[in-house]
Regions:
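Short S/T/G/P-rich N-terminal loop/turn motif that feeds into the first structured element of a domain
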Residues: 1-50, 54-69, 77-95
Length: 95
């Protein structure tokens, strides 16, 4: 079952997003293994990212092997604080 992850960064900016995504995605046009979609944009008080993964396990693999280690090392110009996170089992996904 597909698995969704929403990260909200209060006070986050487009510039911080660009620096962070460059550090954790394989390239500007490629998603990490197991990720189906990625959308991001400004929200009322910061920056919000929503990703859908093939399974909860593919999310956890990306989180544990790539995302968290790189964020803990510090990403130059990236988000200064960890995100507020919510997750969900995807009931329906449409193109």
């Amino acid at each position: 079952m597909a698995y969704g992850v929403v990260h909200h960064f209060p006070g986050g900016t487009k510039e911080q997003y660009e620096a962070s995504i460059a550090a954790v995605h394989p390239s500007a046009d490629t998603l990490p293994d197991g990720q189906i979609s990625h959308v991001a944009g400004p929200s009322a008080d910061g920056w919000t990212i929503t990703a859908v993964h093939e399974t909860q396990e593919s999310w956890e693999r990306f989180r544990d092997d790539i995302l968290m280690p790189r964020m803990q090392q510090g990403i130059d110009g990236g988000f200064a604080t960890p995100p507020e996170e919510s997750t969900f089992d995807v009931y329906k996904s449409m193109p």
